[in-house]
């Protein structure tokens, strides 16, 4: 049994690519039957790889997607995944390969192993920063100024930047 990793994705790109990605993912959500038999159902990541023309045997697919949405001008798709152990970068890179105009930002967390990762270092699309204090204490902040204030209070010295 794996530790489950929760990842939020924001795909940004031109309208044609974003709309096509969204329509394909939405068709999987709305389908009465899974493309391929699996233990996750219609939103299994292997179905997503398959509908995009890939081979689910070659790309990590142990998980599912949900919370699919698109912005009003069709340039941003958001979705979340639950996957085994960590963020599936090969899946993310495969989607970006299929849609050359698309870049996918992610933020992932697998608390069992203390894994936290993101490629949105400026918190432009996924504004949530995690600070861990000890083994069980975690705090989430929307921006670095809040993190600096928290750390300043903890150590008794003013912090204003990462330098």
Where are these regions (language model features)?
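Intrinsic low-complexity, intrinsically disordered or marginally ordered coil/linker segments
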Residues: 1-163
């Amino acid at each position: 049994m794996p530790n489950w990793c929760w990842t939020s994705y924001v795909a940004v790109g031109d309208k044609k690519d974003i709309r096509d990605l969204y329509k394909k993912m939405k068709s999987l959500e709305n389908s009465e039957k899974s493309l391929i038999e699996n233990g996750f159902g219609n939103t299994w990541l292997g179905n997503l790889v398959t509908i995009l023309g890939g081979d689910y045997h070659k790309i990590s697919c142990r998980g599912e997607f949900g919370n699919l949405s698109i912005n009003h001008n069709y340039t941003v798709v958001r979705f979340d995944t639950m996957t085994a152990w960590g963020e599936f970068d090969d899946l993310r890179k495969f989607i970006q390969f299929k849609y050359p105009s698309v870049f996918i930002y992610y933020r992932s967390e697998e608390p069992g192993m203390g894994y936290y990762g993101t490629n949105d270092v400026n918190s432009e699309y996924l504004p949530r920063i995690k600070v861990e204090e000890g083994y069980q204490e975690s705090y989430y902040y929307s921006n670095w100024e809040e993190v600096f204030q928290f750390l300043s209070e903890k150590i008794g010295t003013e912090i204003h930047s990462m330098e």
